[in-house]
Amino acid sequence: MTQALQVPSAPARCRHLRRKNGVLLRIVEKTDRTRYAHALRHGCRHRMCEGVHGTEEDAMGSESAEMDSPHATARPQEQGEDRAWDACGVWVKVPPEAQEPPVSSGGPEDPEAPAQHAPPGARVDAVRHHVYRALPVQSSAEDSRGFVDLSVEDEVLARGCSHAPGGESSSDQAADAPAGDAAYSEVPSFDDLVTRTAQSQDDRVDLSAAMSSVVTEEPPEPRGCSMPCPSGSCDTTEFDDLLSSLSHDAPEYPVDSDPITYSASEPSSEGPVRGAPFSDVDAVAQSLMGDAQVAAQGAQASTSGDASTDLLLKIAQEISSIRADLDQLKGTFSRQAGAEPAQAPATAPAPEGTEAAYSGFFCDDDPDETIALTNDELNNILITSEFTEEDGKDSAADAFGGELSGFESSHIGSAAGDFSYLEEDDHAAARVAQEQWVQQGRATLGNEVFDVKEQGAHADRDAAADPSPVAKDDASPEAQRAHVSSTGLDAAGAEQPLNTENVFDDEDTQREDTSFPLPEEQELDVSVPSLEFSAPHAIETAASESSEVATPVAIESPPQSEAARPAQGDSANLAPPLSKSLADEVRSVLGYMDRLLESLPEEKIEEFARSEYFHTYKHLFDELGIS
């Protein structure tokens, strides 16, 4: 910021008023930014240079002739003075009231005369002139209120303006400017000046606060006049009365009512104002604010301490409640652990001979009825069964697969008259039953065959001891063996082939150990029929197993001797008895088949009841004692 320029030394009758393009201009000092802006807007007189170089009335009286001429120009000897004034002030428009001719009755030494006889505008100017002459002139860059001088050369004149204060363009005014006045520059409008001033970052001053301080604060007491007063005295009491009486004539300006706030804890970033006078009031205010701040900090510390204490108490309460909950849970767990759970009653294992309850097709009889089978029936079951070596795991898988396939293939709700799928279901059930018989009867097969061989040996000895002529005529072992084989295979079908199976190999070995020698026997190939439960013969096979009427099987063998014929009556005793475990297994299989029959639709059950296989099926259940 440039230093404030002193008013140059010039004659007492210097030109501070001039006319430019028919507009009366006057110069305003650049000592106060707020006053400078106020002068640009309203053209009023604040700290005018006439307080040093003469009054406005003297200048207007001496140069009234030149001011009236629209094309008046400055005299050559006064152009240098104008440039000197341009260095320390700004030319502004003169308000209309300043253009009125001064009253000749009053002199500059009599301040009351203009107020009594002059027009209102001249009287106001005279009062303002006297008041501002009484104010001391500040030569430094800052006045008593801390306002910094405005450098017009740097902020206004160097920037230039697009419009003159009177509304003329800057280009027209530059053309009309005198050629010798090089320091002449147009004054920008107030709005442009305020905008540009607010954008500057050198010194920012709150205009509203400054205006408030200018309007509300009283002018300081005069410390002395740099120039003699017109009345010969610096007493301004009489002018205070005039100002109060003429306050209604002065224009009213908006004043920002926001007070200036000071912060004792946060100092201003710009630092203290240089040259600001020490104020006791400010010092007391700062001390009071410091005490208040210390007290506030203490209260805040106590409040924070109380808050922390409350927080600790709450945490302690929460911990105690959690501990109580844990104790309660521990007691609950201990009580539950102490109480022994109720033991389920142990179920005694069912005895081996206990019969399972059946809810089959024939459920009228007592389920505990014992099974009564003849030796011939059991022998027929064993002989007609096919014993094959199979993996137990595969058999079980096939058994379950057969069950599932049997259920999945049931055609519920199909058209009447189509019974082809019924036969497939029956065959699947029979196939499952056959596989179970094979697995369950394999364990007891060896013992039963051995018993059959022993019985056959005893029968042969009895036949040999019989003194009948038939035995004497033909008592060859081959005939006896053929007779036994034909008797044991009476239940087989006439057209079914028999598998070769040496059932009586061990019997020949035992016969050699008897007391009487026997000739060498020729082995006969005996084929045992294999029962493959195919679809069309499943029910026929079951019927053949329970049928007592047997068809003789044509076996290629040598002709039987007459000695072996009397032994046919005892061949029925050679059928091995059925073990209890095997009977249970057979009964369980037939019961399972009965339950499968119940799962069929009603139409299929009725169809089976009307068929020729129903009587055979019922007879088989009656013989086995299955209800």
From Swiss-Prot:
Q: Where is the composition biased (Low complexity)?
A: 169-183, 336-357
Q: Which domain of life is it from?
A: Bacteria
From the record, give the cysteines joined by S-S bonds.
none
Disordered: where is this region? 57-82, 96-121, 160-184, 198-232, 247-277, 335-358, 449-579
State what protein this is by name: Uncharacterized protein TP_0179
Residue spans with biased composition (Basic and acidic residues)? 450-464
